[in-house]
Structure formats: structure tokens, C-alpha cells
UniProtKB/Swiss-Prot annotation:
Organism encoding this protein: Pseudomonas aeruginosa (strain ATCC 15692 / DSM 22644 / CIP 104116 / JCM 14847 / LMG 12228 / 1C / PRS 101 / PAO1)
Keyword NAD in record: no
Any single GO CC term annotated in Swiss-Prot or TrEMBL for this entry: protein-DNA complex
Amino acids binding ADP: 147, 177-182, 334, 363
Keyword DNA-binding: yes
Keywords: ATP-binding, DNA-binding, Nucleotide-binding, Transcription, Transcription regulation
CDD domains from the UniProt entry: AAA (cd00009)
BP GO terms, sorted: DNA-templated transcription; negative regulation of extracellular matrix assembly; positive regulation of cell-substrate adhesion; positive regulation of cilium-dependent cell motility; positive regulation of DNA-templated transcription; regulation of bacterial-type flagellum-dependent cell motility; regulation of DNA-templated transcription
Annotated effect of mutating residue 185 to A: Almost complete loss of biofilm formation
UniProt note: domains: The N-terminal FleQ domain mediates dimerization and is essential for function.
Outcome of gene disruption: Deletion results in the concomitant loss of motility, mucin adhesion, and the ability to synthesize flagellin.
Protein name: Transcriptional regulator FleQ
Length: 490
């Protein structure tokens, strides 16, 4: 193993505990066996918590059950991975505990699954220990293209910070349009492979009969139509990152070949006997339930465990509605930067969008913004300008819009420490241009005030508690537009 470690086997079923200890001894794994009552005394025999590779957890009959024991283990070492013996983690367990459960093992465990699970625990442990040894703490806004202050997006950022510059395989889970490729590109950009290529491939968009050639390349004459030799995606990604999007759509025969490459880091082009070595990091993504596919026999379990070393789950947009206003600002800013027009949304329209279900997630929101920018160039969008399916409040319902806005602002402030809260601003590790930062902050607040005031400068100045003439000067400074009826007052 990568260093001297022991497995901590905690099980109140003595017969099962004894049987599993025999299996682990046969595999050459050192373990400490105990029950749920005396685990602290046994763990005290270790020099420190990092000497424990993982915990194999079986029946827990002590007070509070498995959840209480897992909380105790987390207080001892929050980075300690868990392998469950028997049933998988119940759905009602807290998310922070479920995230540390890497696998569940049936008794007697299969040889391959036990080895794969221990391998995942080893990679998981090594990854966290490397980050801890470096003492690296990236600032929360490092991954800037992940827009939002919700708890869900903060958790994604935190997990990305932990795994970015390791070589661990990452499996990104989430509905279509939630930004899985954005996460993959961020992981590559902030890894030690950032100078290497990032090569995406959509496994569901390539016909099954062409997928092998697409991934591994082919030699001239390997099949009808192969008039020249061609490098595959693995070759193109050598030294960098290969992003396998929609991995759940990969046919079973291709899954076997992919598993071999992941295990041996070698492959052959179609029509060639020459074995090539490859050094790539694998990031996979899917919107499908791979565990259900394993049960149905449409996805290989061993491949799943190879890919699922570090899972990251993207929340759907309907579960982080407090991010919608920020996403709108970001999407509009990108349009303006690309000189594709601009629009603004009033408060009622934003509140109406917050009540939409968003089956297409962020992609659906981006398409809506682009559509409205074409239909109402440089206009202020109210509820009446939204397509019918997005109208969930009335423009006149200002009281509802105000209360909803306050609720969203409160949620965002609690999650992210926005101005007005006690949480301090975070200085990026690379530093920043304070003058530019403050100018951007001021411009953003002015724009928010103008949006809330429907573009009326006088009302916006009242919200900002400054003189109207001062606001006009600042708007001229930043090149911001204002309503025609205000221009006549100057």
C-alpha cells in the first residue's frame, strides 16, 4: 500500500467481523477489529487518525446507531472514508455523512468489489492528505464560472477545490443543463495538467460502431472508409484530461475496452497490434442513474467503481433558485461582452423565473435570455414580456415580489456572506487589483439599484442613499445607460 496504514473494522456482529478479518488478513491488509462501544480505545493505539485508511462499518447496536457513530468518527477525522458492510447508506442519512460512504459490501464480499473499494478508499485518503499537507486553502470564488451563492453550489466548489489538482477520477452526476462540462473544464484548468489538452467526447452522440475508433484511433485500412491513419481521443488527451460526457450511453462492449485502458493505461488503435501507453486523467459525467443501470445489467459494476472515485453531484436549478438573479447578470454580461445586445429584468420578472421548475436547468435559462434579447433588444423585461410558461406572478404584485426578493437575498447572504453580513471578503491567493475590484462592485450595485427602480435614476439614487447628480456622474463614468425621461432633466 502507499504507506503504512490499517483498516478499522467496527461491527457488533462478532461472527461476521471475524469472517471479514480472515478475508482481510488473506489479502495482506492490517486491520484493527472492535465493536461500536470500544472503537475509541482501539483507535487510541494508532499514532494518529491518518494511520487509518478507512472504516469498515457493520452493525451498530450502541446508543444513537450508525449515524451517531459516523458523527463521532467524523469528529475524530473528517476525511476518513467509510465502507459499509451489508445494506447501502439509507436515504435519510445526512448528506455530509452519505458523501463519505464510498461503497457497501455484501457478505461474503466479492474479491473484485472488495479490492476496488479498498482502492477507492486509498485514492480518497491520499487525495485529502495531500491537500492537508500542502495547507492549501483556495478562496471560495476560485471557480468563477460556477455562478451562485447557494449552499449547493458552494458544496460543489468545495469538493472541486479538494480534488482539482489530484489525478483521481471524477464522476459528475446531474440533470442535463446543470453545468457538468463547466465543472470538468474548471477541474482541468485548476489541475497540474492545465498546460495539457482538455479533450471532451460525448459518448451518446457517436454511433456505437464508431466509438472505438473515436476513442482509440485507427490505422489506414482498418475498416471500410479508413483511408488514413487517425489518432483517437485518448492520444489527443495524453498529458491532459479526457472528459467522457454521457458515459451512461456507452455500449457494454465498449465499457469492457474502456475498463482495460483505465486499469492498464495502455491501448491499441483499431487495426494495429502496437500497444501505446497513455497518461490521462479521466473525468466522466452522466444524467443517468448508473447504480440502477448496474442492477439492470446495462452498465458494468467494475467500471462504475473505477470512475466513481470522487463523485460530484450538480443540483438542478429549481433547488438553487437564489442563484437565478446572479445567473441572469452573468448571462447578460456575456452577451454584452460579445456585443450581442443586452436586456434587464425587473424584480417581478425575476421572482416569476424563481418560481419556474426549470427542467432544462441553466441551459434553459441561457436560451431564454438570448431569446428575450432578440425580441426586446435593450429593453426592461417584465412578467408580461416573458413567454407564458414562465409567468408565475403578476407585474402588479409588487408586495409578493418584494417579499420573495427579501427571502432570496436573505438565503444568499446566509450562504455566502454578502455585504451587510459579518463574513469577511476573501482575498484571492494570487491577489487582486483593489481599484478594479471596488469599481466592479460599485458598478454591479448601481445596476441592481437601476433594475429595481425600473431604470429611473432618481429612485435608484434613493436606494443607494446618494444624490441623483452623483449617481448620474458614476453612470457616465461606467458607460451605463438610463431612461430618456431622466436625460431631459440633466
Amino acid at each position: 500500500m502507499w504507506r503504512e496504514t490499517k483498516l478499522l473494522l467496527i461491527d457488533d456482529n462478532l461472527d461476521r467481523s471475524r469472517d471479514l478479518a480472515v478475508i482481510l488478513n488473506f489479502l495482506g491488509e492490517d486491520q484493527l477489529t472492535c465493536n461500536s462501544e470500544d472503537w475509541r480505545e482501539v483507535a487510541a493505539g494508532l499514532s494518529n487518525s491518518r494511520e487509518a485508511l478507512c472504516v469498515l462499518l457493520g452493525s451498530v447496536e450502541s446508543k444513537g446507531g450508525a449515524v451517531e457513530l459516523l458523527k463521532q468518527l467524523a469528529s475524530w477525522d473528517e476525511y476518513l472514508p467509510i465502507l459499509l458492510i451489508g445494506e447501502p447508506a439509507p436515504a435519510d442519512w445526512p448528506e455530509e455523512l452519505r458523501r463519505r460512504v464510498l461503497a457497501s459490501l455484501e457478505m461474503p464480499p466479492s474479491y473484485n468489489k472488495l479490492l476496488d473499494s479498498l482502492h477507492r478508499a486509498q485514492v480518497y485518503r491520499e487525495m485529502y492528505d495531500q491537500a492537508r499537507e500542502r495547507g492549501r486553502s483556495r478562496e471560495p470564488n476560485l471557480f468563477r464560472s460556477l455562478v451562485g451563492t447557494s449552499r449547493a453550489i458552494q458544496q460543489v466548489r468545495q469538493m472541486m477545490q479538494q480534488v482539482a489538482d489530484t489525478d483521481a477520477s471524477v464522476l459528475i452526476l446531474g440533470e442535463s443543463g446543470t453545468g457538468k462540462e463547466v465543472v470538468a473544464r474548471n477541474l482541468h484548468y485548476h489541475s497540474k495538467r492545465r498546460e495539457g489538452p482538455f479533450v471532451p467526447v460525448n459518448c451518446g452522440a457517436i454511433p456505437a460502431e464508431l466509438l472505438e475508433s473515436e476513442l482509440f484511433g485507427h490505422e489506414k485500412g482498418a475498416f471500410t472508409g479508413a483511408i488514413t491513419s487517425r489518432a483517437g481521443r485518448f492520444e489527443l488527451a495524453n498529458g491532459g484530461t479526457l472528459f467522457l460526457d454521457e458515459i451512461g450511453d456507452m455500449p457494454l462492449p465498449m465499457q469492457v475496452k474502456l475498463l482495460r485502458v483505465l486499469q492498464e493505461r495502455t491501448f491499441e488503435r483499431v487495426g494495429s497490434n502496437k500497444t501505446q501507453n497513455v497518461d490521462v486523467r479521466i473525468i466522466a459525467a452522466t444524467h443517468k442513474n448508473l447504480e440502477k443501470m448496474i442492477e439492470d445489467g446495462t452498465f458494468r459494476e467494475d467500471l462504475y467503481y473505477r470512475l466513481n472515485v470522487f463523485p460530484i453531484e450538480m443540483a438542478p436549478l429549481r433547488e438553487r433558485v437564489e442563484d437565478i438573479a446572479l445567473l441572469l447578470n452573468e448571462l447578460i454580461s456575456r452577451m454584452e461582452h460579445e456585443k450581442r445586445g443586452s436586456i434587464r429584468f425587473n424584480s417581478a420578472a425575476i421572482m416569476s423565473l424563481c418560481r419556474h421548475d426549470w427542467p432544462g436547468n441553466v441551459r434553459e435559462l441561457a436560451n431564454l435570455v438570448e431569446r428575450l434579447a432578440i425580441m426586446h433588444p435593450y429593453g426592461v423585461i417584465g412578467v408580461g414580456e416573458l413567454p407564458k410558461k414562465f409567468r408565475h406572478v403578476d407585474d402588479e404584485d409588487e408586495q409578493l415580489a418584494s417579499s420573495l426578493r427579501e427571502e432570496l437575498e436573505e438565503r444568499a447572504a446566509i450562504n455566502a456572506g454578502l455585504p451587510g453580513m459579518d463574513a469577511p471578503a476573501m482575498l484571492p491567493a494570487e491577489g487582486l487589483d483593489l481599484k478594479d475590484y471596488l469599481a466592479n462592485l460599485e458598478q454591479g450595485l448601481i445596476q441592481q439599484a437601476l433594475d429595481d427602480a425600473g431604470g429611473v435614476v432618481a429612485r435608484a439614487a434613493e436606494r443607494l442613499r446618494i444624490r441623483r447628480t452623483t449617481l448620474v456622474e458614476k453612470m457616465r463614468k461606467y458607460g451605463m445607460s438610463r431612461r430618456d425621461d431622466d436625460l431631459s432633466d440633466d
